[in-house]
Design a protein with these regions (language model features):
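Residue-level recognition of single "structural anchor" positions
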Residues: 1-308
Length: 308
């Protein structure tokens, strides 16, 4: 069942912290300082912060946000949960401007940084290998547009960024921002993510010809001759192209422009939604919440990436 937006966890701070702690600590509070499980008292009082505990063993104080992307945040927990749910429930994504208006933050920058921290939580700890014996992995590349303000005066189109997507027809998808479509560049990513026991399906790009020999089988379709399927529909890259269609709708319909520096996190979000497409919005939001452990993202990191 999907989460009801009228649920108390989205408007009551105590309920929000209780939900967050139940996901973060299913077996009771864990002290991040000494590692002791379920041996802490909750500090209660008018001046006490929400979710504050004191460990019986090391006597240090802690909250469930330590060691997560929420650490150090002054944003109320119920707004974090609501923002994460809205991003997980929106098929084409949620822009920072929209989130800013809906949640009533003091600044757009706060909402923008919040979105990136939530995307960081969606990042898988391990990528691949996808595919395997008797499975088909599609590999295809596309161009995602940059910002119009960054284009040269004489150019009609903004700079495009190359994205490679690998998708197991019966499983997950992973997308990457790559420098070019040369054989060496493609190989560096594909052989790490896709099992070589897989059948590799691609388009007719010459860079795939040699690479295909490293897999159990390789077939391609030539779009320049209006060929989109072969071998009775077995060879195609339609699944990967479906992924690209969803990506571009998110760019044009929601975000309008995405900078090269932050593109990888948007790719993570789109892959996450594809890989959890059979889940309800509530289940997807819970998975995103579970993924925040052991991850940190500071505003300085995002700002430095934008100016790198």
């Amino acid at each position: 069942m999907s989460i009801d937006l009228t649920d108390k966890i989205f408007n009551d701070e105590d309920a929000a912290w209780k939900h967050f702690e139940s996901v973060r600590w299913p077996d009771g509070p864990i002290c991040p300082h000494c590692g002791v499980i379920d041996s802490a008292d909750k500090i209660i009082g008018k001046t006490a912060r929400h979710g504050l505990y004191r460990c019986h063993e090391c006597v240090k104080q802690f909250t469930a946000t330590i060691g997560t992307i929420y650490e150090g945040s002054h944003i109320p927990m119920h707004k974090w949960l609501l923002a994460a749910h809205l991003m997980c429930a929106s098929k084409k994504g949620m822009s920072a401007h929209q989130l800013w208006r809906m949640l009533g933050f003091g600044s757009y920058r706060t909402a923008w940084f919040m979105c990136h921290r939530i995307r960081e939580g969606m990042t898988p700890k391990n990528v691949g290998p996808i595919g395997g014996q008797n499975r088909v992995v599609e590999a295809d590349e596309t161009l995602i547009g940059g910002k119009k303000k960054n284009r040269a005066f004489a150019k009609k189109e903004p700079k495009k960024h190359t994205v490679l997507t690998l998708v197991d027809r019966d499983g997950d998808s992973h997308s990457f921002h790559i420098a070019n479509v040369k054989a060496k560049t493609l190989r560096e990513t594909i052989v790490k993510v896709a099992s070589r026991k897989s059948y590799l399906a691609t388009d007719a790009l010459a860079s795939y010809e040699t690479l295909g020999r490293e897999f159990a089988g390789h077939g391609s379709v030539d779009h320049s001759t209006d060929e989109y399927v072969r071998l009775g529909g077995f060879v195609h890259v339609n699944t990967a192209e479906c992924r690209f269609s969803l990506m571009k709708r998110a760019v044009f319909g929601t975000h309008h422009s995405i900078s090269e520096a932050h593109l990888p996190r948007y790719l993570v979000e789109w892959d996450f939604k594809w890989n959890t497409r059979k889940m309800t919005d509530g289940e997807r939001a819970t998975i995103a919440l579970e993924g925040i452990e052991g991850k940190r993202l500071t505003y300085r990191q995002t700002n430095e990436a934008a100016h790198a």
